[in-house]
């Protein structure tokens, strides 16, 4: 039997998006993220991070900085009883990347490359999986890959949000009901 995954974007889903976060002391977890990851784990989902990291390509920080922060983040999740099973990232940017990072990539969202790589690595049933993002590019990547449920985190009224997502939620905690079905009143607050 294939595995199910909870795909999580990083900035804006796992942590507050303060723009190119790469320092541990500036990394602020969003309320409810550990409850979400713990609930997913209890239901047999793998938790997989899929994140564009153009700050590397722009020269704001290094891949080593990203790995250091990711290792720390994974350690915190493990301590909270909600381990992260995989982290996929794309450091390139087609317009603003520097040197080898200035390229188009099938891994950069909205392209589905990171999700498809995880599908291969973890033998995933994408149709039975969920993706949570805070940008339409996250939703597009999930939809293109065939992820069954895509959820957009947004603090605005869902009726005012134009999105292709399955539903709009306010925070990570609001995703939990979707792990077992379509969720309560999908698309509304």
From Swiss-Prot:
One of its GO terms (molecular function) is D-glycero-beta-D-manno-heptose 1,7-bisphosphate 7-phosphatase activity. The active site is at 9 (nucleophile), 11 (proton donor). It catalyses: D-glycero-alpha-D-manno-heptose 1,7-bisphosphate + H2O = D-glycero-alpha-D-manno-heptose 1-phosphate + phosphate. The keyword Repeat does not apply. It is an enzyme of class 3 (hydrolase). Pathway: Nucleotide-sugar biosynthesis; GDP-D-glycero-alpha-D-manno-heptose biosynthesis; GDP-D-glycero-alpha-D-manno-heptose from D-glycero-alpha-D-manno-heptose 7-phosphate: step 2/3; Capsule biogenesis; capsule polysaccharide biosynthesis. CDD domains: HAD_HisB-N. InterPro entries: HAD-like_sf, HAD-SF_hydro_IIIA, HAD_sf, Heptose_bisP_phosphatase, Histidinol-phos. Substrate binds at residues 9-11, 17-20, 51-54, 108-109, 135. Its EC number is 3.1.3.83. It comes from the Bacteria. The record marks 51, 109 as: Stabilizes the phosphoryl group. One of its GO terms (cellular component) is cytoplasm. It is found in: Cytoplasm. Its cofactor is Mg(2+); Zn(2+). The record marks 108 as: Contributes to substrate recognition. Keywords: Capsule biogenesis/degradation, Carbohydrate metabolism, Cytoplasm, Hydrolase, Magnesium, Metal-binding, Zinc. The keyword Cytoplasm applies. GO terms for biological process: capsule polysaccharide biosynthetic process. Mg(2+) binds at residues 9, 11, 134-135. Monomer. Belongs to the GmhB family. This is D-glycero-alpha-D-manno-heptose-1,7-bisphosphate 7-phosphatase. It comes from Burkholderia mallei (strain ATCC 23344).
């Amino acid at each position: 039997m294939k595995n199910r995954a909870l795909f999580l974007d990083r900035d804006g889903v796992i942590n507050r998006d303060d723009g190119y976060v790469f320092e541990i002391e500036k990394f602020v977890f969003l309320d409810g993220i550990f409850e979400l990851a713990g609930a997913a784990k209890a239901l047999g989902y793998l938790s997989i991070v899929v994140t564009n990291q153009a700050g590397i390509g722009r020269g704001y920080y290094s891949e080593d900085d990203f790995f250091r922060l990711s290792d720390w983040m994974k350690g915190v999740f493990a301590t909270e009883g909600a381990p992260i099973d995989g982290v996929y990232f794309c450091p390139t940017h087609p317009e603003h990347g520097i040197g080898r990072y200035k390229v188009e990539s099938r891994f950069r969202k909205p392209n589905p490359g990171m999700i498809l790589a995880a599908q291969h690595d973890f033998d995933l049933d994408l149709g039975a999986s969920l993706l949570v993002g805070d940008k339409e590019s996250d939703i597009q990547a999930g939809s293109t890959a065939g992820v069954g449920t895509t959820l957009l985190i947004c603090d605005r009224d869902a009726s005012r949000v134009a999105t292709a997502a399955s539903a709009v939620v306010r925070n990570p905690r609001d995703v939990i009901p979707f792990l077992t079905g379509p969720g309560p009143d999908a698309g509304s607050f």
